[in-house]
UniProtKB/Swiss-Prot annotation:
Protein name (record): Golgi apparatus membrane protein tvp18
Family designation: Belongs to the TVP18 family.
Transmembrane segments: 12-32, 38-58, 82-104, 108-127
Carbohydrate attachment residues: 11
Keywords carried by this UniProt record: Glycoprotein, Golgi apparatus, Membrane, Transmembrane, Transmembrane helix
UniProt xrefs under Pfam families: Cg6151-P
A single BP term in Gene Ontology: vesicle-mediated transport
Domain of life, source organism: Eukaryota
Length: 148
C-alpha cells in the first residue's frame, strides 16, 4: 500500500501518524533553534526537543526493536498504541508548548499548533471508532505487531 492509498482510506490515525512525523522534524528544529534564548524559554525549547525524541519512538515502532532501550521505557512507549492515548500524549506536549507563550511569543507556537492538530487527528479517529492503523512506510504493518 502506497502513501497515497493509505491517505485514501480516510483513517484519521494515518493522518495523525504522518502529522506526528512532521512534528518530529519541527520539534527537533525549533527545540534547537530556541535553545539560544537567554530566558526561561530555554526550558520550553528543551521540552520541545525531548518531545521530538518521544514522538520518534511513538510513531516509528521499528526503532524500539533497533535501539537499545530499557524495559521501563519500552513499557512506557507501549501505552500509546491506541488512538485515545496518542491523542492524550500529543495534547499534553501541545499544552506544554502553548504554555511557552507565558514567557514570550516564539516559534514554539508552530510546534504547539502542529502537536494540537496531531492530537485532533487521533481524537477524531477514536471518536469515529477507527482502530489504530500504522503506516506501512513507517513499519506499521507486520513489524509493529512483533514489537507489541
Amino acid at each position: 500500500m502506497t502513501i497515497a492509498e493509505e491517505f485514501a482510506t480516510r483513517n484519521f490515525s494515518i493522518y495523525g501518524q504522518w502529522t506526528g512525523v512532521v512534528c518530529i522534524l519541527l520539534c527537533f528544529a525549533l527545540g534547537i533553534a530556541n535553545l539560544f534564548h537567554v530566558s526561561l524559554l530555554i526550558i520550553f525549547s528543551a521540552l520541545c526537543l525531548v518531545s521530538s525524541f518521544l514522538i520518534i519512538f511513538i510513531e516509528i515502532p521499528l526503532l524500539l526493536r533497533i535501539c537499545p532501550t530499557s524495559s521501563t521505557f519500552d513499557t512506557f512507549m507501549r501505552r500509546f498504541t491506541t488512538n485515545y492515548m496518542r491523542a492524550a500524549i500529543y495534547m499534553g506536549m501541545a499544552i506544554v508548548q502553548w504554555l511557552s507563550i507565558i514567557i514570550a511569543a516564539s516559534s514554539l507556537i508552530a510546534a504547539a499548533v502542529l502537536l494540537t492538530i496531531a492530537a485532533g487527528f487521533y481524537a477524531l479517529a477514536g471518536l469515529k471508532g477507527q482502530g489504530f492503523v500504522g503506516s506501512k512506510t513507517l513499519g506499521g504493518q507486520g513489524v509493529a505487531q512483533m514489537i507489541l
